[in-house]
């Protein structure tokens, strides 16, 4: 089980990333625009650096919805491998069954 503070930190990062998403996209568009002047591009870089660090989507961590486990996360289910296996064994995931050959 992950600490509550770690889960809360990820929730905070998700909210910040959502809040600054449009501003971040606009600044990155200016930075990658070849037709923009060097000064405009440099100012966009400086503005991007002033945004909160946690507003970057790459700072978010995928976590299991039930346990908060950060490793062995399966995106399709939103759970860790352990919880997916437990749910599959109980028959809670439609269409998923144990492999046998």
Curated annotation (Swiss-Prot):
Domain of life: Bacteria
Protein name stated in the entry: Small ribosomal subunit protein uS14
NCBIfam families: PRK08881.1 (NF006477)
Covalent S-S links between cysteines: none
Subunit structure: Part of the 30S ribosomal subunit. Contacts proteins S3 and S10.
Molecular function via GO: rRNA binding; structural constituent of ribosome
Record's function text: Binds 16S rRNA, required for the assembly of 30S particles and may also be responsible for determining the conformation of the 16S rRNA at the A site.
GO annotation, biological process: translation
Gene3D superfamilies registered for this protein in UniProt: 1.10.287.1480
Record-level GO cellular component terms: cytoplasm; small ribosomal subunit
Family: Belongs to the universal ribosomal protein uS14 family.
